[in-house]
A protein has these predicted regions:
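Metal-assisted phosphate- and nucleotidyl-transfer catalytic regions
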Residues: 9-131
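Catalytic palm subdomain of template-directed nucleic-acid polymerases
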Residues: 1-4
């Protein structure tokens, strides 16, 4: 319900302030009309890198990072590696409002475990114009 609440709230604010759901930001026209697209984090990574990290362990993800020519170090665990991949290859591509969902539990250890997959969490971030707008 929180994603629905968030998108409806933002849509209403845009309408009340601007009289439209569309906002020009630089060269982009952002349309805040609900509903917003929803993409899982791992699907986003697969779409933008070609690598499916589902079920991979830390060492396998480390190998993917090396294949992607990323700068990583030994202090980075599984969650940090996934976060780095997403940040470098995916985050900046979301111009229109998009909820990124189903974060790996290693990235959010204090977040509620996903209702159907214990390796994921019930978390989302709203990406707009290549940036994180909110996180819940």
């Amino acid at each position: 319900w929180m994603m629905e609440f968030t998108e409806k709230m933002i849509e209403k604010i845009c309408l009340d302030v601007n009289g439209t759901t569309q906002v020009k930001v630089g060269d982009n026209i952002i349309d805040f009309k609900a509903p917003y697209k929803r993409v899982t984090m791992l699907d986003s990574i697969k779409e933008h890198t070609g690598y499916d990290l589902t079920g991979m362990n830390e060492e396998q993800i480390r190998e993917v990072c090396q294949k992607l020519n990323m700068e990583i170090d030994d202090t980075m665990g599984k969650g940090k590696l996934i976060d780095e991949i997403f940040g470098e290859f995916c985050e900046g591509t979301y111009i229109q409002p998009t909820f990124i969902t189903d974060y790996p539990k290693e990235m959010s250890p204090l977040t509620k475990i996903h209702r159907s997959n214990p390796d994921l969490t019930e978390r989302f971030e709203l990406m707009v114009n290549g940036k994180e707008l909110c996180n819940a």
